[in-house]
UniProtKB/Swiss-Prot annotation:
L-methionine binds at residues 57, 100, 245, 276. Catalyzes the formation of S-adenosylmethionine from methionine and ATP. The reaction comprises two steps that are both catalyzed by the same enzyme: formation of S-adenosylmethionine (AdoMet) and triphosphate, and subsequent hydrolysis of the triphosphate. This is S-adenosylmethionine synthase. GO terms for cellular component: cytosol; nucleus. It is an enzyme of class 2 (transferase). Keywords: ATP-binding, Magnesium, Metal-binding, Nucleotide-binding, One-carbon metabolism, Potassium, Transferase. GO terms for molecular function: ATP binding; metal ion binding; methionine adenosyltransferase activity. GO terms for biological process: methionine metabolic process; one-carbon metabolic process; S-adenosylmethionine biosynthetic process. ATP binds at residues 16, 166-168, 234-237, 245, 251-252, 268, 272, 276. Its cofactor is Mg(2+); K(+). K(+) binds at residue 44. Mg(2+) binds at residue 10. It catalyses: L-methionine + ATP + H2O = S-adenosyl-L-methionine + phosphate + diphosphate.
Amino acid sequence: MAQTFLFTSESVGEGHPDKICDQISDAILDACLKDDPFSKVACETASKTGMVMVFGEITTRSQIDYQKVIRNTIKSIGYDDSEKGFDYKTCNVLVAIEQQSPDIAQGLHYEKALEELGAGDQGIMFGYATDETPEKLPLTILLAHKLNAAMSVARRDGSLPWLRPDTKTQVTIEYEEENGAVIPRRVDTIVVSAQHADSISTEDLRSEILEKIIKPTVPAHLLDEKTVYHIQPSGRFVVGGPQGDAGLTGRKIIVDTYGGWGAHGGGAFSGKDYSKVDRSAAYAARWIAKSLVAAGLARRCLVQLSYAIGVAEPLSIFVNTYGTSSKTSAELVEIIRKNFDLRPGVLVKSLKLQTPFYLSTASYGHFTDQSKPWEQPKELKF
């Protein structure tokens, strides 16, 4: 009998307070990069009832209207009325932005060629890929994202007009292990919580989310009579967004990545330009892991990179294929070294990291949009 186990991942919608902050930080990063691709940005956001504060270090030639960028982001998320607990028109916006520290700037060698740009800090970054879905992402996190995205669509197109932007989902899948690879067999449990208008009853909300969100989103063959649904387990959820909880950039790093699979080095992504290896090298590690799986070199793969401030080359490369590769870890590391130049100033070019596309990564995961450069597997020579 094959060994089975349950694994769970969660995701949150655009209106979750922490995700609002991620999106504001990345909207500011995009605004900086739009007119100055060499902008240096480290932008944090905090939010609570009726208030947003952005703070950090930004060095850019772009003229940024922070008020406008922040309010437009909140508006596009859907908080456009105080009845929803937050309103882009009336919220208080505080800005405490300074220039990048000259000590950090001199350590990164901006005066040299871009290829020789030193890493913006020390740190460890991980990338993960698995052959269980075409996207090479764990199905648990993929379905959790898709459920939140479906609620966003239903809220915007009017099919579920009582929905509000703050949503949360969690998906538990029963997996079978096969020589280190994992195969999803069925969905065991689905949890959905959604902020809603006062006008809808909990009973109606539960049946509408089951019929209009869960059933069209989750493949029918994965649902069975044993699947458990916890829809709005708290009952009411009218007070949401920053009114319900304080929000902070960088508090949803597992939602942003692999839903608990693989590993995480601890560095958040949003609000950071490409010189911050927390972001650029984590994208590169994902690119490597996905390329190895796509090339048939492994069915599951975890890659670790590490850097030191001011040093361009990674200090170490580690690969774990969970016993799914015919090659040794040392052979795979050699393949990585031959195929990938992992200096931050080269990653900028190979992954197009000066493009102002970061706001689009700040909700529903950084590895779900298959058009992004790090999601295009590289053809490997080995």
